[in-house]
Amino acid sequence: MGFIDGLLGNASTLSTAAVQEELAHILLEGEKVEAAFKLVRDLIVFTDKRLILVDKQGITGKKTEFQSIPYKSISRFSVETAGRFDLDSELKIWISGAELPAVSKQFKKDESIYDIQKVLAAVCM
């Protein structure tokens, strides 16, 4: 996956070492990045303790929101794959006590949503 895939919304796998360094200022001491995916400018990061969603905002991307979700708080998740005429896949994550999904991410038609689902299943089950 390359630059064009990123622009089109296809998630690409990132180096865990690079993400570990980039997020060092918000990671706990000893916390380790297990897997990371990039979606345009946003990141979906799985550590050994939590899920971190990084939302880079604005034209320059300097304004950044870090959403931290402990794995124990994830009550369920769903993956809706793209169909023949529907070009988008969608990942939804619910947290304990919430009726609506706390997270909803759109993906273009590609296989990376399956990789993200596998990691999410491994850490939540």
Swiss-Prot record:
Gene3D superfamilies referenced in this protein's UniProt entry, alphabetically: Bacterial Pleckstrin homology domain
Q: Which InterPro entries match?
A: PHb, PHb_sf
Superkingdom, according to UniProt? Bacteria
Put simply, this protein is called Uncharacterized protein YjqA
Provide the species name: Bacillus subtilis (strain 168)
